[in-house]
Amino acid sequence: MALSAAIVLAAGEGTRMRSNKPKVLHAFAGKTFLNRVMDSVAALNPDTLAVVVHFQAERVAEAARSYDEQVTIVNQDDIPGTGRAVQCAMAQLTEAGKVDGPVLIAASDMPLLDSETLHRLVEFHTASGNGATVLTTILDDPTGYGRIIRDREGNVLRIVEQKDANRSELAVQEVNTSVYVFEASVLTEAIAGLKSNNAQGEFYLTDALETAKAAGKVGAFAAPDPLTVEGVNDRVQLAALSKTYNRRVCERWMRDGVTILDPETTWIEDDVQIGRDATILPGSFLQGHTVVGEDAIVGPYTTLIDATVDEGAVVERSRVQESHIGARTNIGPWTYLRPGNEFGEDAKAGAFVEMKKAHIGNGTKVPHLSYVGDAQLGDHTNIGGGTITANYDGVHKNRTTIGSGCHVGAGNLFVAPVEVGDNVTTGAGSVVRHAVPSDTMVYSENTQHNVEGWKPAWER
């Protein structure tokens, strides 16, 4: 199945989104619409992948290039319409000598368009010997979509847009998905004769099918799952489609042995991996390339972003980003793990603890009310409540190292850079500014002053 070119249409503004950014750059399950469609199209290995841009052209082009540096960017001029977008693309690709064979065309506002559906569409097109093939689907409510008009033998006659359809045409439930395959020669001839005599005053790509009939057979392939070709035009549709899709994702994980108590409030993105017998509690968000191990418990009300949670670990009411949590380690409640943390096994970061670029050894516990940043803590060390590693001197971030088997008293302050050896005990309220050797007790001797008979100002 050789695909000469794939053209992704990403020129529109998407005015119904009421947004300052193009519709194709809105996110769906962790990726932009554009990147999701490019993912699916690229899986077919077209000889050339082109993206047509216009509204905020450079912004969209940059997003496309960040996905694929080799992508061909086509700038659509001010003449509106999908037909004009394809005219611009074909002119640029033909001039570069990059088109000779089947050409796939896809809109970029269908975040669930999948490579399997596209693969079957191209196979059907080739096997049927079509000059053009449109991907269709059947909808209970086809409002807003172009209708597929067939003759009595079932052949595709044309596609009629909603605003141009008469009453009988509006009753048709088979709709255009804005995904097509054309033979390059047929497409070139068909788009040459496009006109803008319609309610929108645009060059419709759909009109090319009528012209294509004269140059070759026109067929239609129905997508087996309407969800894969559902478009998003506004934020209401985005929310509805997101919810439907997320429910499917949760159901898939539940069938694979993961307990999800409330799929309605649990959100799991595509690249997340979850082990068997893990439990995801309500209000949890698993994002990016998060990995959750077997028997781990996540939630309730927890956000994991590109995090790794090993087997048997518990993360409760916390936010964890780009951090690794070792087996049977407990995080939370109300813990904030910023990027770069590495926990050993059987460790703990408890209530109201914030960490950043901290390496926490096996069995080491930071139970509550502490900040640990740019630090290394050895094995089986206990950090008292209210402890701070003062890592920033106004210019540089400095490291704190605390060894294994240490007992750090409450309210300690470590002024980095500073190193503390193994088996060290610090007194409550200590300020540690200098290196402490192993097997040492250190404390700061602060003088206590009592002022007898003291009254607050409002009682004087």
UniProtKB/Swiss-Prot annotation:
A Pfam family reported for this protein in Swiss-Prot or TrEMBL: Hexapep
Enzyme class: transferase
Linker: region residues: 236-256
Annotated residues for binding of Mg(2+): 109, 233
Pathway membership: Nucleotide-sugar biosynthesis; UDP-N-acetyl-alpha-D-glucosamine biosynthesis; N-acetyl-alpha-D-glucosamine 1-phosphate from alpha-D-glucosamine 6-phosphate (route II): step 2/2; Nucleotide-sugar biosynthesis; UDP-N-acetyl-alpha-D-glucosamine biosynthesis; UDP-N-acetyl-alpha-D-glucosamine from N-acetyl-alpha-D-glucosamine 1-phosphate: step 1/1; Bacterial outer membrane biogenesis; LPS lipid A biosynthesis
Annotated stretches, region: Pyrophosphorylase: 1-235
Localisation: Cytoplasm
Chain ranges passing through the membrane: none
Enzyme Commission number: 2.7.7.23, 2.3.1.157
Active site feature: 368
Function: Catalyzes the last two sequential reactions in the de novo biosynthetic pathway for UDP-N-acetylglucosamine (UDP-GlcNAc). The C-terminal domain catalyzes the transfer of acetyl group from acetyl coenzyme A to glucosamine-1-phosphate (GlcN-1-P) to produce N-acetylglucosamine-1-phosphate (GlcNAc-1-P), which is converted into UDP-GlcNAc by the transfer of uridine 5-monophosphate (from uridine 5-triphosphate), a reaction catalyzed by the N-terminal domain.
Stored NCBIfam families: glmU (TIGR01173), PRK14352.1 (NF010932)
Name of the protein in its database record: Bifunctional protein GlmU
Protein source organism: Bifidobacterium longum (strain NCC 2705)
